[in-house]
Structures are given as structure tokens and as C-alpha cells.
């Protein structure tokens, strides 16, 4: 019996097309394209184009989803005069795509023009009906953390851990670090020989001041350390309060 007329025909009908047809065989049927109307052909074309676009968007999303919380090199394509938002191109080859570096995610005082190269931090990659949205930033604390991970081998290996970061982008950043191995100076590791490691981070951030302090489980010690370079006489944590 024919259960699905759209894809099945009876054995008698099949043998009119191919006299050797058997049950379960596939039979090729010629379709006269002249029978299709102009609207049907246009609809088929749109469906195919839409499928290709969705496949391309999926490929772009897959390419950049793994790059969340990474630093990528971008090229400034244009700057929107009304808002100051920048359209930048990230990636290369078939994986390149455009992203927006919003004015709120730009560091005050940094100036760019079309064609400039800028390193951006990928905050998030989202799916949307218009394709993947890639949120990038120059002000996110994650940019500082990732720069130190790239410059300091002890952080990359896990011997030094970044516990917290407080950032006023373009002005000053405080980064609290902790050694997970004995005989490792976490601050010294981040500063590097002759200040080379922290200097590379500062250069990338266009002179942003960088305070590196030792993290401690003891709130009083940590607060005193975090207040450097100020001279702290004493710190008292009030019982039952968070200050």
C-alpha cells in the first residue's frame, strides 16, 4: 500500500516507469521544470539562500564561541560619528566577522581612526536572528587578567593565581595575586625582570597605572595590602559588618 504519496508510488505505477522495478526500489522520475511557476521558483531560491546564510552564521558562531575571554586583534573599519561606537573586523580568512566596540567599552583618552589595529577582549558570543553577536571590550577587567596570563609564565602554569581585579580603565588597575606554590613571589613574578612583564601590560593599556598586591585570606591583611601605596597604620574589621 502507498502510505506517503509524496515519496511513494505503487508497484504497478513504478513498472510503467521502469519495467524491472521491485518493491523497495528507488525509481527516478523526471520532473518538467516548466510546470513550476515563477513564484514557486523564487520561493525555492529564497529557501536555498536562507539555508546557506544560516549555515554560514553557524560556522562563524562555532569559530568564535571558543574565543570567549580571549584577546583578539581587530581592525577598525569605521567609527559612527553620532555615538562613537566602532565597527571592527576580527579574525581572518573564512572566519573573519565584524563586531562592535561600543563607546562605553572604549578607554577614555584612547583615539583610533579607520584602519588602526586594536586588541580587544571578547566578553561574550551570542546567537541572534541576524547572526552571531560578538561583544568586545577595551575596559573589561578580563583584558588585564588575560594580558598577565600571556606575559607571566607562572600565571599560565598555575603557580600564581589572579584572585581579583579592580579596574578604572585608562587610569589605574589593582590586581590581587596569590602564590599556589612555595618559594614563589607572586608580585615579583608579575613584575618580571626589570619590570618587563608588567611594563608590557602597561604599554598595551597605553600607560594605565598598575598596582599588584598580595591577596590574603585575612581581610585585614588583604585590605592593608590593597590600599598600597598608602601607608596603612591599622585595619579593623567591625564584627558583624562587611566594612
PLM feature spans:
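RNA-contacting regions in translation and RNA-metabolism proteins
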Residues: 1-243
